[in-house]
């Protein structure tokens, strides 16, 4: 029996609550199987006082979205002096802001797509760049609010400026990159491997592709040339280190090989709180690298810390 008491933080109150509940349950169950004493904490506004009373040895952060992966919960854990998994305050905040993260990784030679930040109301009547392009909320995950504007589309999508839009007023407009969706997991200072995501019946890796059964297929390891495979691993590790991530992260890429095998590789974003069910991408990539789900989570618990 392992002696550590682990508080698994799950749920929360962001739009990604259902995803977090799924990740948190899987992690809590697996950690119990590994011999840890586990308490499941469905996070509310009183989480600070709950954790202060609970006094766990480690907090396993299974939250997703604002509050859970933007540096907020990380700051609370730092204040309480509770070691926690995944990235720290600054790296979490930077990674959650897609535009700022892109600026940082670009300085270390990671290729990114042309983009600009705009107010959503300012792009209602005129294209902010020549289509095709993608509109993304600056601070959301799980592909919430992502809109693809196709080549030849005469007007910007009206939903972005409407009352239906629930993802903040600031959006990132990014050049659309044709090609295959690839992702690479990083564990500590090692890139674990590259997986291809093949959406089923979807134009890109949206919410349903990620979380609805049969929404996508995963090709692990990705069937690309050894040079491209190594390049993506190198870029993912560079992004992880440049943003200041710790523990586990996952970088997403587009790979356009329509005209040559070497093609164009473009980094899209780094996820500091990737999905953590046994069938999620990071555990799947880790399994191909020889790490079981339980072993991966145990490593994360032992890697947990404050102030780094």
UniProtKB/Swiss-Prot annotation:
Subcellular location: Cytoplasm
Cofactor: Mg(2+); Mn(2+)
Any single biological process term in GO: regulation of cell shape
Domain ATP-grasp per the UniProt entry, residue ranges: 102-302
Pathway: Cell wall biogenesis; peptidoglycan biosynthesis
Keyword check for Cytoplasm: yes
Reaction(s) this enzyme catalyzes, per UniProt: 2 D-alanine + ATP = D-alanyl-D-alanine + ADP + phosphate + H(+)
Residues reported in the UniProt entry to bind Mg(2+) 1: 252, 269
Enzyme class, first EC level, given as a word: ligase
Keywords: ATP-binding, Cell shape, Cell wall biogenesis/degradation, Cytoplasm, Ligase, Magnesium, Manganese, Metal-binding, Nucleotide-binding, Peptidoglycan synthesis
Protein name, entry field: D-alanine--D-alanine ligase B
Gene transcribed to yield this protein: ddlB
